[in-house]
Amino acid sequence: MRCKEKAMAIVLGGGKGTRLYPLTMDRAKPAVPFAGKYRLVDIPISNCINSGIRQIYILTQFNSASLHNHIANTYVFDTFSNGFVEILAAEQTNQTDTWYQGTADAVRKNLKHFHDQDADYYIILSGDQLYRMDIKDMLDQHIASGAELTIASKPISREQATGLGIIGCDEQGFITKFYEKPANDLDISEYKVPASYMKDSLGKEVGENNEYLASMGIYIFNAKTMEEVLNNNKTDFGKEIIPDVIKQRKVSAYLFEGFWEDIGTIKAFYETNLDLASISPQFNFYDEQMPIYTHRRHLPATKVNFCNISNSLTSEGSIITNAYIVNSIIGVRTLIESGASLDGVYCMGASYYETEEEKAENTKKGIPNIGIGRG
């Protein structure tokens, strides 16, 4: 899948990640380990690459060293390609001496870098979501509709609508209104998706489980439109820019029916990860047509000695001895010693193996070794 049109992706990842603390204590949110061997940022980047979009910027601000290392070691395109994955960290210049004030402000302050690519379309993606999407299909619809902005939209139930931004559209799929996180007792029936548009887009009937549309925080802008709507002091896409654009310009909804989850909280992070270890997970990492890419670590296969392991994922480079593990995920280079019992555990893994000398030093200091000790 190759894009004939010049499209460029921008992954937003510069927030403090306070809802994911302490996982974001020393690293940016997109660099948080996920599913044992991946990083959160691998999801949007992989979706772009699988869709033929090879010019990708990652916007960061906090604790970006780990993210820089991951990107540099993972996404290296060949010499004869014009593709790249490049990190743009917040910077102070002669024109501005403030950090990113929000998602829109982050994009605005980097427009000078984007201009070099002469893109026709800007694709805005989040760095903390799990989904698999052919972005080329969304781009094709955006161009065909003649819209200035297209918003990826997930059909949901009324119960789910409370925590999301809700979109109202007409029978042609053009967005007419937007409501941010409606209360449970609020009547939002006017926001129900038209049955004809649901049928035309997804070939499905409207029911209680899909009668409303939630914004996924994934946008495709015409390049000129995005520069125009950012020519102000507004700082946030979801709260300020998008509602104003809907009122003033032609905005289309792209319906997406696949799995999609925001992983911005500890609860969502934990539950989404453990679901991956279930017999029939909602998201399938075993897709050869649209794989999720990550850093090739060149680690040996996991060694399992006298263990009872079920409904779990074990990542490469781990050594597990005489342990009971169920409904859990074991990260890379994890050492689990005899007698340990893990149920419903996400073990993040390690960046390196400790030497015998380091372990002896740990004993002297009275601190544990990396990994899980004897049970």
Report each predicted region and the residues it spans.
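Short acidic/His/Gly/Ser-rich catalytic and metal-binding motifs that mark active-site loops
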Residues: 17-22, 186-190, 355
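Conserved core of the sugar-phosphate nucleotidyltransferase
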Residues: 133-220, 232-233
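Conserved beta-strand termini and adjacent loop/short-helix elements that scaffold enzyme active sites
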Residues: 88-90, 152, 254-256
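Left-handed beta-helix
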Residues: 1-8, 13, 196-209, 223-375
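Short beta-strand segments
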Residues: 12-13, 124-126, 152-153, 179, ...
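Short coil/turn connectors at secondary-structure junctions
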Residues: 5-7, 53-54, 82-83, 118-120, ...
